[in-house]
Amino acid sequence: MNSNIEKSDKPSFIKISEQPSLYDDLEKKSVREILEDINKEDQKVAIAVQKAIPQIEKLVTQIVPRMKQGGRIFYMGAGTSGRLGVLDASEIPPTFGMPPTLIIGLIAGGDTALRNPVENAEDNTTRGWEELTEHNINDKDTVIGIAASGTTPYVIGAMHAAREHGILTGCITSNPNSPMAAEADIPIEMIVGPEYVTGSSRMKSGTGQKMILNMITTSVMIQLGRVKGNKMVNMQLSNRKLVDRGTRMIIEELGLEYDKAKALLLMHGSVKKAIDAYKAG
């Protein structure tokens, strides 16, 4: 027997996200063939996300009570994964009227990395935790790592330190049994399969990550009372389109004339506040 071979009960880690594409000779295909192939692969993403719903539910149900006590969400990632975390976090203030400090996206390499690659940033195992401590992270907060491969050192280092400090950790990955998932209290494994262009995780993996991030923040915000019926009653009135939309929400709820509803909205600054003030007399 080879003494270098060790038996292990741990499930094997397979980088499915980097396996060869199911398609070849892409440069020989017509534009229509390429588009249809990509669309065919994209249809697998929603199915993979659906299978992950039980884990997404577990994470959301742990996040909500923490946020009711003043907790926050920190997304952590590199490259596409980091950018998607920043994107989702940046949509929370305008959509739900919450402060930008409630859900924070951190990307390896900082804001520069949103547009340009930052060399070796994702390989730094300590910088992620340093950034979290700069935000005074505490045990009411949640850290969610995002990495298709599940191997990003910047993310894994931060999650490991967070767990050591009793902070809830989750993750979104496209590979089973990854090192990142090992650092997550609640791992979300979204197995979308090989990418159309081998290893290009901005494709199916990125699409699935965005879907799951939407699900997490939308369900959390609904649970926190930031939606009424099916409407964004706490949205920020940052342009004429949204002022008009908010005005029509008030008309639907209160039956007022347009000008009166708009004046009420502008006076109180949000649909919810305007409706509550009107009903209070």
UniProtKB/Swiss-Prot annotation:
Q: Which residues form the active site?
A: E91, E122
Which reaction(s) does its UniProt entry say it catalyses? N-acetyl-D-muramate 6-phosphate + H2O = N-acetyl-D-glucosamine 6-phosphate + (R)-lactate
Entry keywords, A to Z? Carbohydrate metabolism, Lyase
Pfam families for the chain: GKRP_SIS_N (PF22645)
Write the signal peptide boundaries. none
Query: What Enzyme Commission number(s) appear in the record?
Result: 4.2.1.126
Enumerate the spans annotated as SIS domain: 63-226
| Cross-referenced InterPro entries | Etherase_MurQ, Glucokinase_regulatory_CS, MURQ/GCKR, SIS_dom, SIS_dom_sf
Listed SUPFAM superfamilies: SIS domain
Kindly give any further remark recorded in the entry: A lyase-type mechanism (elimination/hydration) is suggested for the cleavage of the lactyl ether bond of MurNAc 6-phosphate, with the formation of an alpha,beta-unsaturated aldehyde intermediate with (E)-stereochemistry, followed by the syn addition of water to give product.
State the family it belongs to.
Belongs to the GCKR-like family. MurNAc-6-P etherase subfamily.
Protein name as it appears in the record:
N-acetylmuramic acid 6-phosphate etherase
Q: What organism does the UniProt record list as the source? A: Bacteroides fragilis (strain ATCC 25285 / DSM 2151 / CCUG 4856 / JCM 11019 / LMG 10263 / NCTC 9343 / Onslow / VPI 2553 / EN-2)
Q: What is the lineage of its organism?
A: Bacteria, Pseudomonadati, Bacteroidota, Bacteroidia, Bacteroidales
